[in-house]
Amino acid sequence: MSSARFDSSDRSAWYMGPVSRQEAQTRLQGQRHGMFLVRDSSTCPGDYVLSVSENSRVSHYIINSLPNRRFKIGDQEFDHLPALLEFYKIHYLDTTTLIEPAPRYPSPPMGSVSAPNLPTAEDNLEYVRTLYDFPGNDAEDLPFKKGEILVIIEKPEEQWWSARNKDGRVGMIPVPYVEKLVRSSPHGKHGNRNSNSYGIPEPAHAYAQPQTTTPLPAVSGSPGAAITPLPSTQNGPVFAKAIQKRVPCAYDKTALALEVGDIVKVTRMNINGQWEGEVNGRKGLFPFTHVKIFDPQNPDENE
């Protein structure tokens, strides 16, 4: 295992703010094993994503912000983000630990010729999010759809600004049709980031799951007892009882909300720990750690 080469308390070294999934992919693709960055989630404002170069690919792990001001990744909870990073300095996510943060500006992939570092004005750019569709009325206008992110080029008038879209097209936009996006400071405290977590929303199934570090329960309390095998959904319906409440992010339409005591019909057991199931006609994904499989041999344990 390579030794970690970063200070987890130096937030400016690893926190990149509201960069998109695609930008994180670009920064980490082809980089050395264990290089990582932490960014704002574009799907759930207030959450984070840990993006890591591992096993010749880039994996993205969702970090949920809990109401008690703690942070959760997989089945692990932490008091703060530096503690989470310290944990994964010595524990594998999938095939790697965290070794070093990605440079704040992308480096060429390993094996390519390095280009000289050029100054960039990225941090000085002003971004806006479009609130409505705008078809454009004149040739000089910049048409857009609701939800696009634009870069402001110039403000020649109070109600009309010059902007550039992701395709590089420049034109005039009506100011009442957009809202400003304020880039968060690398040293800023965790707070309301609804207005700056921009980028293309990421579907829940696109996130990887870190290895579980919690040992599976034994059949009995005696040491060395055999592990209870999971039933197969191919042999008929599998039912489980929710043992933990789950309130998914409102933006995640694939997640299944759970109340303690809910009976879940498990339809698929994915190896990444995100199971698929149904409760009262509602279908979706949920972590397997939130439920307990019914044991037909011990009905009393289902209570």
UniProtKB/Swiss-Prot annotation:
Q: Which PROSITE patterns match?
A: SH2, SH3
Residue span, SH2 domain: 14-102
Q: Which GO terms describe its molecular function?
A: cadherin binding; identical protein binding; phosphotyrosine residue binding; receptor tyrosine kinase binding; RNA binding; RNA polymerase II-specific DNA-binding transcription factor binding; signaling adaptor activity
Q: Which InterPro entries match?
A: CRK_SH3_C (IPR035458), CRK_SH3_N (IPR035457), SH2 (IPR000980), SH2_dom_sf (IPR036860), SH3-like_dom_sf (IPR036028), SH3_domain (IPR001452), Tyrosine-phos_adapter (IPR051184)
Please state every residue range assigned to the domain named SH3.
Answer: 123-183, 235-296
Residue ranges of the region described as Disordered: 184-234
Which one GO biological process term can you cite for this protein? Answer: spermatogenesis
Q: At what positions is Phosphotyrosine found?
A: Y127, Y207
Keywords, sorted A to Z: Phosphoprotein, Repeat, SH2 domain, SH3 domain
Matching entries from Pfam families are given as: SH2, SH3_1, SH3_2
Gene Ontology terms, cellular component aspect? cytoplasm; cytosol; extrinsic component of postsynaptic membrane; neuromuscular junction; nucleoplasm; protein-containing complex
Q: What does this protein do?
A: May mediate the transduction of intracellular signals.
Q: Which family does it belong to?
A: Belongs to the CRK family.
- Subunit comment for this entry? Interacts with tyrosine-phosphorylated EPOR and INPP5D/SHIP1. Interacts with DOCK2 and DOCK5 via its first SH3 domain. Interacts with phosphorylated CBLB and IRS4. Interacts with BCAR1/CAS and NEDD9/HEF1.
Q: Which PANTHER family match?
A: CRK-LIKE PROTEIN, SH2-SH3 ADAPTOR PROTEIN-RELATED
* Protein name (Swiss-Prot/TrEMBL): Crk-like protein
**What is the species listed in this Swiss-Prot or TrEMBL entry?**
Homo sapiens (Human)
- Classification lineage: Eukaryota, Metazoa, Chordata, Craniata, Vertebrata
Q: Could you tell me the gene encoding this protein?
A: CRKL
